[in-house]
Every structure is written in structure tokens, then in C-alpha cells.
Amino acid sequence: MSTVNTVTEQLTRAGQAIEHGSFAIIDEEAGPHAYTDEQWPIVRRMIHANADFDFNGLTRFHPAAVRAGIDLLLGAKARGGAHIVADVEMICVGLSAPRLKHFGVQTHQFISDDDVIERAKAEDTTRALRMAC
């Protein structure tokens, strides 16, 4: 029985084949781009998740962003875990549970919490803005 690298691969051969095929189509359709070898897999996955090729060219990275993210993930378990807070549930649902577990990362979103809703109503603002404060 072979072990699947759940960090970079889908869990099944069929899933891997579909993802690899999709990524090949995206690479072909996107053509040349100005992203680094570290940045392109992120942009390609954004295109894959949204079926929106406009992410190619619109996405910008701080020069240290990718390295900072990798360092955070690699050190998360040693620090007792890490947390991703999102403003919508869809982000949390869209993240791979095996990958999150591998790195010791937990996701959280509070957009539907009663206190967030009540505070947003009281201050006549959005729930996402209330979460950020």
C-alpha cells in the first residue's frame, strides 16, 4: 500500500489525475506569466478553485509573503498549532482537512455568531467588519 502525500496531492489516483489534468489546462491557457516558481502554484490553485483566469495578472504578492506563509506552516506544529480566521465559512470549508491536520492548523469563522450579528446591527456595519475589529 502506498502512502499519498496529502500535502501536495489529492487522496486518490482518480483525484490526482483530474487535478493534474486541470492544472495542465490552466498552465496552457494561462501561457507565460511573471510569477515565480513559488508564486505560480498559488495563483494556479486560485484559478482552479474559481475558474477565473483573471487571477493571472491581477494577483500580487509581497516579496516575503510566500516564504512567510511556508515558514508559518512548517513551524505551526512546533508552536502548538496555528489558526486561520476567515470572514466567511466558504474559506474554511474549501481548505483541505488532511493538509490542515498535517500542519496543525485550525480554521475559524465567526460571521454567523450571535454576538457578531448583534454588534454589527447595533453599529450599523457589516458582520465581516465587526469580526476584523
Give short role names for the model-derived ranges.
Residues 94, 99-133:
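Long, charge-dense
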